[in-house]
Every structure is written in structure tokens, then in C-alpha cells.
């Protein structure tokens, strides 16, 4: 994305969106296995539709987990606890269908086995990390405020501040840029599921005053257009309105389309899967590059071959904002970051006791605060700067 005048849009979805329900269930199952056995190999997929949950995948672990009960607890926490919504934690049919990880894959990711003795990547693939200095979190502004809106909306619902709110919700933020810098919010879209006993005008007024104006700074709301539940009604929602699947919100999970994506989803995957762990490392690297002042904007690509520990390539793009050459930056990255699967897991403490991947499954994996989000630390900035 070049430095010029443009308008850019990103979206987010709430914790009650069908795809996000699935992501949270998959990550809650992952957490339960890792808590009992840190060496668990987990690839957990979830499907939801009207009062039905199907869990499937490949899991090899010494742990014993009640996936059905975990799913019900997640659904209950989100707020689907009323059968009239068509999806209810206590009445949904929940089935689990899992089997062991293929031994052909296992030998490539288990240290001491396979053609290469070091722990190899769990699959081939390419992963991207991105950072930009237009928000304090070093995230693109459109996705940052999209997340903040649905997060605030969930807080209003759980706090019973707006009694008409129901779990399913989406947001979209359009930002106007001048000379590559954000100057104003052009458009905000919020669609939220609601109870039948509220008017569209009441919803519109409440969301503008209690959500949008509480989240987005007033100086950015300049001639901003608001579209609140623009179909006019959103009573039927959640898995009753649309089927959901794990891994179907990968752009919401990352940079809202502002940075590139390698195509691999995160939720339900243990850290041996570089789809997840290397994307976290990419963000860690890019954020430290920007935090160091070596670039205003940075995108990192890592690529792996299945069963091989070292990445097959490391690529950096600073979009003309770099203070040193990209070739020199790659050298410094290789010198300061461990890029093997084992090195990534150790550096980012991805198997640390008590870690909850479920926390990542709503409101984006990046630009977040808290001990879970170790890839958001900027402790390598000084070393990179040299």
C-alpha cells in the first residue's frame, strides 16, 4: 500500500458471530488438552448451525478432555442461553469426532524422528506478520477500531447496559488517509442482533452514543457516516441465522486486509503448526522493527517446508519507510530471532502453563494486551536498532 491519499476499510465480528463461536470452541478444546499434556498435537475444527455443534479433527494427547462439555461452556459464556434464539448451550446437540494425528506428519514434527532430527514445521506454508505506527498498538487503524467497537458492544451486553443486545454482531470501519496517514473515520457500520421489542431508531441512537462515540476519539468523527443495522432488523442471528466454521475469519484475526495473509487459520491448532506460531513470530518481528524506529511500516514473510526446522525464506518489506536496507534488516532479524518451530515456541512461551488460546479467538490475535499475547512485546527493539 503506497503513501498516497486513499480510503481503506476493515471489518471485525463479535464473539457471538457463528464463525467466532467455532474458533472459541476449537481453542477451548486446544487449551484443555495442552493444560493436561503440553506435547499434545491438536487440530480441532468446529461447525455450528441451528442447535447443532460438530467437533472434528486430529488429536494426539495423553490428556482426557470432554469436548462436548467444553463446547457447551463456551456457548454459555458467549450468551447463547435461550432456546428462542435457535442456539442454546443446554439444548444444542453436540457431537465430537476426532482421531489421532497421522504418524507421517508426527515424525516430521517430533524431535528425533523423521529425516531431520530437529523439530520440523508441521506443514509447508507462508506466514505474514505486519506492524504500522498509526496506532499506539502498531496496528492499522481500520481493524483496530473495528475490534474495539465489537468488544465494547459485548461489554454493554454482558453488563446489561443495553438490554436489547444479543450475541451476534459485526462492525466495519472506513478510514480516510492523506499522504499515507489516517486523518478521519469516513464510515462506521455496526450490525447487531437484538431482541424483538426494540425499534430501529432506539438501536441506532444507543449504538452511536453508547458505543461508537465511547470508542472512537471525537477528532476522528468528522462528517462520519453511520450505518446501524442497515437492513432494518437483525433478530435472527448467530448459528441459527448462519452456519459457522472454524478458521473462516482469518482477515478479521489478523490485519483487516491491510497486510497480506498466507492463508492458514489459527484457532484449534497447537503451536507445532506454523500456520499459527510463525504468524505470531512474524507479528513479533514486524512490531519490534517498527518499535525500534527502523521503519514506519513493516511486513515480514516466513515460509517453511514440512518436517524442516529452519524457514526456507525470510522476506521483509518496509514500503519505502525503512531507515536501513531490507537486506540488512533480514540479517538483523536472523541474528536476533529464533525462527525454528522450537525456537518460536520457546521465545514466545507458546506452551507456558496456564496460557489460554481461547483469549485470542475473539477481537483479533494482534494489537492486544495481556500475558497471553507475548508476540506483542517489543523487547527486541533495542537489539534490532543496534
Swiss-Prot record:
Chain intervals for the UniProt region annotation (Flexible loop): 101-111
Binding site for ATP: 17, 168-170, 242, 248-249, 265, 269
Reaction equation(s) it catalyzes: L-methionine + ATP + H2O = S-adenosyl-L-methionine + phosphate + diphosphate
Cofactor, how bound (note): Binds 2 divalent ions per subunit. Binds 1 potassium ion per subunit.
Positions contributing to Mg(2+) binding: 19
EC top class named in words: transferase
Enzyme Commission number, as recorded: 2.5.1.6
A cellular component term, taken from the record's GO annotations: cytosol
UniProtKB keywords: ATP-binding, Cytoplasm, Magnesium, Metal-binding, Nucleotide-binding, One-carbon metabolism, Potassium, Transferase
Subunit structure and binding partners: Homotetramer; dimer of dimers.
NCBIfam families: metK
Gene Ontology BP annotations: one-carbon metabolic process; S-adenosylmethionine biosynthetic process
UniProt-recorded name of the protein: S-adenosylmethionine synthase
Residues reported in the UniProt entry to bind K(+): 45
The organism's place on the tree of life at top rank: Bacteria
Keyword ATP-binding in annotation: yes
Gene field: metK
Chief location category: cytoplasm
Family: Belongs to the AdoMet synthase family.
Membrane-spanning ranges: none
GO molecular function: ATP binding; magnesium ion binding; methionine adenosyltransferase activity
Described purpose of this protein according to its UniProt entry: Catalyzes the formation of S-adenosylmethionine (AdoMet) from methionine and ATP. The overall synthetic reaction is composed of two sequential steps, AdoMet formation and the subsequent tripolyphosphate hydrolysis which occurs prior to release of AdoMet from the enzyme.
Locations listed in the record: Cytoplasm
Entry binding sites for L-methionine: 58, 101, 242, 273
Pathway where this protein functions: Amino-acid biosynthesis; S-adenosyl-L-methionine biosynthesis; S-adenosyl-L-methionine from L-methionine: step 1/1
Amino acid at each position: 500500500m503506497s503513501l498516497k491519499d486513499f480510503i481503506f476499510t476493515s471489518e471485525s465480528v463479535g464473539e457471538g458471530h457463528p464463525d467466532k463461536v467455532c474458533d472459541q470452541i476449537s481453542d477451548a478444546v486446544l487449551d484443555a488438552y495442552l493444560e493436561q499434556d503440553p506435547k499434545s498435537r491438536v487440530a480441532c475444527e468446529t461447525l455450528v448451525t441451528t442447535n447443532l455443534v460438530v467437533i472434528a479433527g486430529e488429536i494426539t494427547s495423553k490428556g482426557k478432555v470432554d469436548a462436548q462439555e467444553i463446547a457447551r461452556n463456551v456457548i454459555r459464556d458467549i450468551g447463547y442461553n435461550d432456546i428462542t434464539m435457535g442456539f442454546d448451550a443446554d439444548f444444542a446437540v453436540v457431537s465430537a469426532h476426532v482421531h489421532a494425528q497421522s504418524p507421517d506428519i508426527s515424525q516430521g514434527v517430533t524431535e528425533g524422528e523423521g529425516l531431520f532430527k530437529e523439530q520440523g514445521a508441521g506443514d509447508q506454508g507462508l506466514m505474514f506478520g505486519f506492524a504500522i505506527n498509526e496506532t499506539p498498538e502498531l496496528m492499522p487503524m481500520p481493524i483496530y477500531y473495528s475490534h474495539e467497537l465489537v468488544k465494547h458492544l459485548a461489554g454493554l451486553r454482558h453488563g446489561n447496559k443495553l438490554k436489547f443486545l444479543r450475541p451476534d454482531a459485526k462492525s466495519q470501519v472506513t478510514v480516510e488517509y492523506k499522504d499515507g496517514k489516517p486523518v478521519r473515520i469516513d464510515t462506521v457500520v455496526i450490525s447487531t442482533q437484538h431482541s424483538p421489542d426494540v425499534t430501529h431508531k432506539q438501536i441506532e441512537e444507543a449504538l452511536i452514543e453508547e458505543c461508537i462515540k465511547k470508542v472512537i476519539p471525537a477528532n476522528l468523527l468528522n462528517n462520519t457516516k453511520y450505518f446501524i443495522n442497515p437492513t432494518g432488523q437483525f433478530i435472527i442471528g448467530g448459528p441459527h441465522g448462519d452456519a459457522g466454521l472454524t478458521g473462516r475469519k482469518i482477515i478479521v484475526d489478523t490485519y483487516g486486509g491491510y497486510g497480506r495473509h498466507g492463508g492458514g487459520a489459527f484457532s484449534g491448532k497447537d503451536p507445532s503448526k506454523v500456520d499459527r506460531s510463525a504468524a505470531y513470530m512474524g507479528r513479533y518481528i514486524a512490531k519490534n522493527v517498527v518499535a525500534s524506529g527502523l521503519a514506519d511500516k513493516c511486513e515480514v514473510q516466513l515460509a517453511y517446508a514440512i518436517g524442516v526446522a529452519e524457514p526456507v525464506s525470510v522476506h521483509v518489506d518496509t514500503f519505502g519507510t525503512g531507515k536501513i536496507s531490507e537486506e540488512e534488516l533480514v540479517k538483523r532479524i536472523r541474528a536476533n530471532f529464533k525462527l525454528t518451530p522450537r525456537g518460536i515456541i520457546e521465545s514466545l512461551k507458546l506452551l507456558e502453563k496456564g496460557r489460554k488460546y481461547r483469549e485470542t479467538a475473539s477481537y483479533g490475535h494482534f494489537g492486544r494486551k495481556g500475558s497471553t499475547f507475548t508476540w506483542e512485546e517489543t523487547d527486541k527493539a533495542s537489539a534490532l536498532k543496534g
